[in-house]
């Protein structure tokens, strides 16, 4: 899938933006806070029906405005044009349309335009709680497996209902707990099996990317932990019910799964330097891209937001070689350092566009300005 053109009104600090893109490489440079990340976030929104950084849609509307609109004009691998529209008014439900037809469920759109974003916010994958790492698995698997996304939605709905019962100060019949526990167990087993299969296939791809970027200087790994591996999920939930009632929420289940991120045999959260952490995160996301490309019917879009920060020159050079190669499709990349972008452009050749970003205004540079 190629994003040919984007139209943006009142999204974050972007008042009005109309841009045509290169099918290969699109570079955005400017100082921090000018709107580079917001442009990438608008592209992300068109794939995931939400912002990468702010889940509250109304807070993405430009200050003192009542709405935002994002429109993307794409071209599929077979040349078919696709138009995606998102509109949001304050105090109203957002609209999401494909070729002018509104989706009845936003989840039906997930995976239609596969996308991988690498950004500074990824540091939470290492530094943050286990929910960040579960979200990483969810974002990847949901883009190629509708059954997974449906099971995850069912599980979370049942989890909310069970937690409501656990908080109740009134006596609750066991049969009522069983209704939701059986739903959690059924959906949770699907989620567990698919997470386990994904991680098994993903690990060697991830290790290969890390090895290339670091030039074999360190070994890395991933391990997946789940209550569903230890026993039947239904039995786990039933056995935990008394303690859960005391706490007022569900202590066990696939919503507590963990993805351990390792440098050697130890948690990278504890052992990794800034450069090793950044290398780990970039390798994770590039492996995510490669995995989605292998499993899907279309090449994902790749968004790279300020990825060279905290990396030494040799690792920057390895990443430049990767993204300039033929393995990746359409790329959107931001940086405050024009030299980083110039090094990539030198390797890519002529198929690129360069944009200058200043105070929410984005302008394509003429060839003589580049």
UniProtKB/Swiss-Prot annotation:
It holds the Pfam family SMC_N. The keyword Ligase does not apply. One of its GO terms (biological process) is double-strand break repair. ATP binds at residues 30-37. GO terms for cellular component: cytoplasm. SUPFAM superfamilies: P-loop containing nucleoside triphosphate hydrolases. Gene3D superfamilies: P-loop containing nucleotide triphosphate hydrolases, RecF/RecN/SMC, N-terminal domain. InterPro entries: DNA-binding_RecF, DNA-binding_RecF_CS, P-loop_NTPase, RecF/RecN/SMC_N, RecF_2. It is found in: Cytoplasm. GO terms for molecular function: ATP binding; single-stranded DNA binding. Its main location: cytoplasm. Belongs to the RecF family. This is DNA replication and repair protein RecF. It comes from Bacteroides fragilis (strain ATCC 25285 / DSM 2151 / CCUG 4856 / JCM 11019 / LMG 10263 / NCTC 9343 / Onslow / VPI 2553 / EN-2). The lineage of its organism: Bacteria, Pseudomonadati, Bacteroidota, Bacteroidia, Bacteroidales.
